[in-house]
Regions:
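Terminal amphipathic helices with adjacent charged low-complexity linkers/tails
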Residues: 42, 46, 51-60, 74, ...
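Acidic, glycine-rich flexible loop/linker segments
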Residues: 488-505, 670-739, 746-749
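Long, structured ligand/cofactor-binding scaffold of large enzymes
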Residues: 8-11, 15, 20-195, 581-633, ...
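Mobile "lid/hinge" segments at catalytic clefts and subdomain interfaces of large enzymes
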Residues: 3-4, 68, 151-284, 416, ...
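Short glycine/threonine-rich loop-to-helix capping motif typified by GTGT followed
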Residues: 47, 147, 151, 243-249, ...
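Non-catalytic terminal/interface segments that mediate subunit docking, oligomerization
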Residues: 76-80, 305-401, 405, 524-659
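Extended C-terminal subregions enriched in glycine
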Residues: 379-429, 435, 643, 649, ...
Length: 752
């Protein structure tokens, strides 16, 4: 059985009482997010009001989800914990390692062959430790979770930053690094800074070409990629009723691009219907019995500004189709503005490829509505100018969409149907192009559009839109086509318009599938052997990191001073590097290769202070490590934005980088650095960033007095003999300081 139904029955039997106790203790009405948080305290006796954005709280999530690229490192760490089985229900999803090339029929067998060693490892670990296993082709982790595991009022963590997708079905679902997941898998408390609460008030109703995707694209323009840091976005208002559960999941999914801890919608009839349509009638009934506590209290809705830290107002009737980009998901542009904005910013205006899919927009409803546009192009005889690529979200969706003729609608206009996997969204795309460095534009229904992310080309301008708009712009081949107002020519030269998209929320004949690709957790695990070859270049057993030696860090060479945006894609690239996600030594060769060096404006070219040569970042780091020298990275704002990949923290740790000094950090990455025993520090005065010079030797003092709220001192020794001194700060609590001293959180846990 896929679901752990006894766990769910037990949860719902006590949920409303837990919420009632919370309200009685804090003596006030609660938002929905607060209800879920308080119902999942690791130690219910610690129930009290917590200072949002400041205090750390221990929680007990209901389950863990892991995708194949991050599960490798998470499970390698779990294997060192000495447990016989996982403490909570868990699942592994093989969706990240499948490369999109010529189509699913050939790509999936090739992936199974290429990644056999990793798939065998993940399958055997899953069998040994009682973890559900979704094989290659089964689907994208977050779509599979929504269809099978998500439940209103629950809490889950996932080793992927878009885990908040499950908030569309009323979960507090948080993206974490593997070390955080191991805490939950081993039954330990999971620590999280009590989030701030941003209330998003939805009024009106979407119409025409406007979609749920456009709601979150508009919010990104308002809040930016930093605006949700250490916050939960909770949606409320009469506008909720007009948005489907999968539409709500799309909105929650891209809350990750705001830096939000997660996003959440309350339980409603749409959620109940989704549960029933996906074969979870009992959960729908259990949720209905608790419905009063699966939403914010009436007093909160009557006076939201008294309960939320910030309110965002969105009138759905005024939402326009958006194209966000290029290079950052918060560059929000209503499609009606693109005719002026495109040429003014020298965008390449020809759309060469349109890509529909990803964990953000690959539901049945997404494909059905996008197919209605493809169908019009075929029926009206409109020449399709761009290449269209489709990645269904799960085998259940693919099978049902094929049965219902949806995939045929795409194929009739020349679309390629790729595997049920992430594919191009994470750089797993063998793009067929005449020049992989040429300036060009693509449009996607994905969630991120960082430079080089999709195809490795720094000159690909990637724009994010809805599946419907993506198909329309691909048909026309222009970025500045507004389907609500513009005409195009049919095969006879007549002016025609594309009608607004239509499509069923659920398949009229119900969902269908022959083989979901799922292997249930097994109780017969005693004889399962997990084999890792010592000669493997893809999997490597982990050795513990060394503990702190009790001394200040002196005369550290500057490894790199990064300039501008430095995401986890810049720190640890995906694409061709995904195959090394289970081998820390090998993947460390990509350390910071995408980051821009502030001193020369180039990527992956830094000065090795030992000989003055300019080399790759990892080469310099390895040279310092070989001499027993630790180094430091200096960065700007929101360092580590993007995915949850803990490799972006483990790689510098492995190469003896001890400190990341930034203007600010993204939430998940800051936690990952702490978990690996690194020092994630911030400038007290951001202008001190400008004092750091290329040849500096940098010292950090005050570590013997390292304590919550304490300041540390940085000394820059410049090449000319002069010095600069300034203070830096941190957000470490006592437990996190203990992780640093032990060498990592895993080391600390092993000592307890």
């Amino acid at each position: 059985m896929i679901l752990d139904i006894e766990m769910l029955r037990s949860f719902y039997a006590s949920y409303s009482e837990s919420v009632a106790q919370a309200k009685a203790t804090v003596k006030r009405p609660l938002t929905y997010a607060e209800k879920v948080l308080f119902a999942h305290l690791f130690d219910p006796t610690q129930l009290r009001s917590y200072k949002r954005g400041v205090e750390y709280v221990d929680f007990r999530p209901n389950r863990v989800a892991m995708q194949d690229a991050t599960a490798q490192m998470a499970l390698l760490q779990f294997m060192n914990a000495g447990k016989d089985k996982v403490a909570v229900p868990a699942s592994v999803h093989c969706d990240h390692l499948i490369r999109a090339d010529v189509g699913a029929t050939q790509d999936l067998p090739e992936a199974c062959k290429t990644n056999k060693e990793v798939y065998d490892f993940l399958k055997s670990v899953s069998q040994k430790y009682h973890i559900g296993f979704w094989g290659p082709g089964a689907g994208i982790i977050h779509q599979v979770v929504l269809e099978n595991y998500a439940f209103p009022g629950g809490m889950m963590v996932g080793t992927d930053s878009h885990t908040p997708n499950a908030g569309g079905l009323g979960m507090v679902a948080v993206g974490v690094g593997g070390a955080d997941a191991v805490d939950v898998l081993t039954g330990q408390p999971w620590e999280l800074k009590m989030p701030r609460l941003i209330g998003v008030h939805l009024t009106g109703k979407l119409s025409g070409w406007a979609t749920p995707k456009d709601v979150i694209l508009e919010i990104l323009g308002i809040l930016t990629v930093k605006g949700g840091t250490n916050a939960i976005l909770e949606y409320f208002g009469e506008g909720l009723d007009s948005i489907s559960t999968t539409g709500k999941a799309t909105i929650c999914n891209m809350g990750a691009e705001l830096g939000a801890t997660c996003s959440i919608f309350p339980f409603d009839q749409n959620a109940s219907e989704y549960l029933r349509k996906t074969g979870r009638e009992e959960i729908a009934s259990l949720a209905q019995m608790n419905a009063a506590e699966l939403r914010a209290d009436d007093e909160v809705l009557a006076d939201p500004s008294a309960f939320y830290d910030q309110i965002v107002e969105i009138d759905l009737s005024k939402v326009e189709p958006h194209l966000n980009g290029p290079f950052t998901p918060d560059a929000a542009t209503p499609i009606s503005h693109m005719k002026a904005k495109g040429p003014a910013n020298d965008y390449p205006m020809v759309v060469e490829v349109g890509l529909v899919g990803s964990c953000t927009n690959s539901s049945y409803q997404d494909l059905a509505r996008a197919a209605s546009i493809a169908r019009q192009a075929y029926e009206k005889g409109i020449e399709v100018k761009g290449q269209l690529i489709i990645n269904p979200g799960s085998e259940q969706i693919r099978y049902t969409a094929e049965r219902d003729g949806i995939l045929d609608d795409f194929k009739k206009i020349g679309a390629l149907i790729m595997t049920n996997a992430c594919g191009p969204c994470i750089g797993q795309w063998k793009r067929h192009t005449d020049d992989n460095t040429r300036k060009n534009a693509i449009v996607t229904s994905f969630n991120r559009n960082f430079r080089r992310r999709a195809d490795g080309n720094p000159n690909t301008f990637a724009f994010i839109g809805s599946p419907e708009l993506t198909v329309a712009l691909t048909i026309v081949g222009r970025l500045d086509f507004n389907p609500a107002t513009d005409t195009l020519l049919d095969k006879d030269g007549n002016s025609v318009m594309l009608d607004a998209p239509t499509g069923f929320t659920f398949p009229p004949k119900g969902f269908a599938v022959e083989d979901k690709g799922f292997i249930a957790p097994s109780e017969e695990n005693a004889n399962v052997e997990v084999v890792i070859s010592p000669d493997s270049n893809r999997l490597q057993k982990l050795a513990p990191f060394a503990p702190w030696d009790g001394k200040d860090l002196t005369d550290m060479p500057l490894l790199i001073k990064t300039e501008g945006k430095c995401t986890t894609d810049h720190i640890s690239m995906a694409g061709p590097w995904l195959k090394f996600r289970g081998h820390l030594q090998n993947i460390s060769d990509n350390l910071l290769m995408g980051a821009v060096n502030a001193f020369n404006g180039e990527s992956n070219k830094v000065k090795n202070q030992l000989d003055g040569a300019y080399v790759e970042v990892s080469t310099a780091a390895k040279a310092y490590k070989a001499k027993g020298i630790c180094s430091i990275v200096v960065a700007e704002d929101n360092y580590g934005e993007g995915s949850s990949r803990e490799h972006a923290a483990m790689e510098p740790r492995f190469l003896n980088v001890k400190v990341i000094l930034a203007k600010s950090f993204a939430r998940i990455h800051e936690t990952n650095l702490k978990k690996q025993g690194m020092l994630a520090l911030t400038f007290c005065n951001k202008d001190d960033y400008n004092k750091v010079q290329e040849d500096d030797r940098i010292s950090l003092t005050g570590l013997k007095e390292f304590a919550p709220g304490s300041k540390l001192t940085v000394t820059l020794k410049h090449k000319d003999g002069s010095e600069d001194n300034f203070e830096v700060e941190h957000t470490y609590n006592d437990t996190q300081i203990a992780w640093f001293k032990a060498g990592s959180a895993l080391n600390f846990a092993a000592k307890k």
